[in-house]
Amino acid sequence: MERRQFLRGTGAAIGGSLLAGCAGSDGRTVTVDYAYYNPVSLVLREKGWLAEAFAETDVDVEWVLSLGSNQANEYSQGGEAEVASTAGIAALMARSNGVPITTPYVYSEPEWTALVTFAETGIESVADLEGKRVAATRGTDPYFFLLQALDDAGLSEDDVEVVHLQHPEGQSALVGGDVDAWAGLDPHMAELELEHDGAELFFREPAYNTYGFLNFLDGFLADHPDDARRVVEAYERGREWAIDNPTETAGILASESEMSQAVAERVFTRRTDLSEPLPGDAHRGLLSDLAPILEREGLVNDDADPAGSIDDLLDAEFAADIVGDAGSGGE
């Protein structure tokens, strides 16, 4: 099997996205990503709650922007971030390829991806994609969503021309007519849906979305478990606040992503579920169903065992005593 590069760089926004969360100089730094597809991370960054969780330690907090699961996995692979946000299947792909990550926390259950086109293309179903150009970001949930949709229609990646672009660039390519369809990701997908006439989500399947996984480097969990707990505790505070304050959370998403309040509310109030933060049987079952895709599409190394890596990836115990005990969740 030919090995394919499974973590692709973007080179975009990295330098400008590193923001110090607190000002110590003698201690360690914990680097955590934030992402427009992870609203709770935006809440923590806006409120300063992660820095607050480390305020009485000698540990600095640094934020780095992830534009997609592929970039988040790059941070993990290079040891550039101790904590990073990906889709579930992207986390399994990375773990299967030897990236030392564990998922003790699920930051969302979203319907964040669908297949998008414009009415004038004449595309009405997945079968109509045969021979067409489709934008997608390899190694992310929209890419795996596309593969599952093609499989359902009796097609494969070989039957379409996949144009590998980061999510915002895929949106722009569709608007500009450079591709016929796009495996979209919110909030960019919702922006297209609400603010561009003729945009259509022509294929939706919530079950093909693979959750939002918060991945911790194994070394961070082993060597600094108290710091890892502080991160989870901050996430619990942010999750509970976001559930109680959906309009305000959408406002933070709108501000950070530079999109309208209407787009942000579509994403957060209609397509994002924060109710189940612990990995469990549902996540394990979904990854088991999708593991063969990683091998079939050549997205893991020849000696990788995606199905066997699921147990190595998911940790249902680490955060179990934290969830529900994070405090008030408020200001």
Go through the PLM ranges and name each one:
Residues G48, E52, E74, G78, ...:
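Solvent-exposed, polar/charged alpha-helical surfaces in well-ordered, non-transmembrane soluble domains
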Residues R28-L155, V162-H164, D180-A183, L201:
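Short, glycine-/small- and polar/acidic-enriched structural segments
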Residues L294-E331:
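Conserved C-terminal helix/tail region of periplasmic/extracytoplasmic solute-binding proteins
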Residues I89, V162, Q166-S255:
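Pocket-lining segment of extracytoplasmic ligand-binding domains
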Residues P39, H224-N301:
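Secondary-structure end/capping motifs
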Residues M1-L18:
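N-terminal secretory signal peptides and thylakoid transit peptides that target proteins
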Residues F54, E80, S85, R95, ...:
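Sec/Tat-exported extracytoplasmic proteins
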